[in-house]
Amino acid sequence: MPEPDSPFGELIRNQEMREKLTVIKVGGKIVEEEATLLQLLNDFAAISGHKVLVHGGGRSATKIAAQLGIESKMVNGRRITDAETLKVVTMVYGGLVNKNIVAGLQARGVNALGLTGADMNVIRSVKRPVKEVDYGFVGDVEKVDASLLADLIHKGVVPVMAPLTHDGQGNMLNTNADTIAGETAKALSALFDVTLVLSLIH
């Protein structure tokens, strides 16, 4: 406890009073393999208190793109997202992977809600400018609506966030899941005592 005359006493007390929130990011390998997905669902459901889950899905996107005859191009571990690839990642990240996680969490008593950045304008991004590499339809996060997420969280909803954002002009953007987790945690840290956990398995 702070000393009564400490100049930081009120700040420290406010920190102690803030609700705790855990933001967890998991990579594609975890959510795309049945055994690790089941373990994730069980472990995440067991975490008490407010929480947010951010997921990847790159392996599934690569697999389905290949089945559709669309070549996946990577530079420095980042996906080049042309118009056709954007369709694939939107379907895979925002649909297949996200909804499988949401359904699994609902089965475990977690009131999960799947979101992309376009849903309720929760995360807006700007298309990454072309420098040495043209990454295509890849977004750099501009704003996370922390108030909206906090409202959902306080209503008992657990956001499950796909690695997709939008530019506010009708365009979806492929966005790095680590970045989404970090920016979400940063925005929510104004309202909660946030712990950010980034999985090292991609």
Locate predicted features.
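Ligand-binding beta-strand-loop-alpha-helix segment within the catalytic cores
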Residues: 66, 70-160
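Charged helix-capping and loop-helix junction motifs
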Residues: 37-41, 174-182
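N-terminal glycine-/serine-/threonine-rich phosphate-binding loop
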Residues: 7-53
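Glycine- and Gly-Pro-enriched alpha-helical subdomains that act as flexible
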Residues: 181, 189-191
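Conserved small/polar residues in nucleotide/adenosyl-binding loops
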Residues: 202
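Structural motif
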Residues: 21-25, 52-54, 158-162, 197-199
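Short, C-terminally biased terminal segments at protein or domain edges
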Residues: 2-4
